[in-house]
Design a protein with these regions (language model features):
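Short beta-to-alpha loop/turn elements within the nucleotide-binding domains of ABC transporters
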Residues: 168, 180, 186
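Binuclear metal-ion centers of metallo-dependent hydrolases, dominated by the metallo-beta-lactamase
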Residues: 176
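Domain-scale signature associated with acetyltransferase and cell-envelope carbohydrate enzymes
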Residues: 1-164, 172, 188, 197-221
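Short linear motifs in intrinsically disordered
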Residues: 61, 181-182
Length: 221
């Protein structure tokens, strides 16, 4: 889907899609889905996007990628962003699955990754071989041997330069403080800060459908 976007997109005779006025000259990848009123920002965000999935990236209704966020994927990576979400200069690194649901907000410099490449998880010989293979790959992408899916539930706010590590699920309505390193699952409506992240309090769950409908009624008079 590429109609009724927040940015005009033109299709060339060869089928390539370009964002009108984009400062970066590359076309958008063919295997991404942009819902109505979505704001992809720039094709620069996809310079390290190597997903071979039928739909390797989806940006939901009225969601936006702002400030030159970057989406780095391996051939099996799949990034899904729900409705009314804001990604502000966010880096997503995905070899398996990163899912961001509706009404989420990511502040500038935040990072989400579903992959590990550390000295503790791979031997020097294995890492050396992976580097050799990447050097001869057209994409230069190093595939993680053990990616772990990341799930961000509805209405989550992530502060600037926070890092969400592989295998983490963040529950609905949670807040992640700036520069927090999230290493384990976060309960719904928890406020998490620090390195490693720890819960310091819980919020009242006011983002219910009943409250939402009441606010809409008030706004519409």
């Amino acid at each position: 889907m590429h109609e009724h976007l927040a940015q005009p997109v033109r299709e060339t005779s060869s089928g390539d899609l370009f964002i009108e006025g984009d400062w970066f000259p590359n076309p958008l990848p063919a295997n991404i889905s942009l819902d109505e009123m979505a704001y992809p920002d720039t094709s620069y965000s996809f310079t390290t996007f190597f997903s071979e999935k039928p739909v390797g990236f989806s940006l939901g209704y009225a969601s936006g990628n702002y400030g030159h966020g970057v989406f780095t994927t391996g051939k099996n990576g799949e990034i899904n962003v729900g409705k009314f979400a804001v990604l502000q200069c966010t880096r997503i690194i995905c070899d398996l699955s990163v899912t961001i649901k509706d009404h989420c907000m990511f502040s500038w410099g935040s990072v989400i990754t579903d992959r590990w490449l550390t000295a503790n998880t791979l031997s020097p010989d294995v890492r050396r071989q992976m580097l050799k293979e990447a050097a001869h790959s057209p994409t230069r992408h190093i595939e993680s041997p053990d990616p772990q899916a990341v799930l961000i539930e509805d209405n989550v706010w992530v502060g600037f330069e926070a890092v969400i590590l592989p295998g983490v699920t963040i529950g609905q309505g949670a807040i992640i403080g700036c520069k927090t390193i999230v290493t384990e699952d976060v309960p719904p409506y928890a406020v998490v800060v620090g390195n490693p992240g720890r819960v310091i309090r819980f919020l009242d769950p006011t983002d219910t459908e009943e409250n939402r409908q009441q606010l809409i009624s008030q706004l519409l008079g």
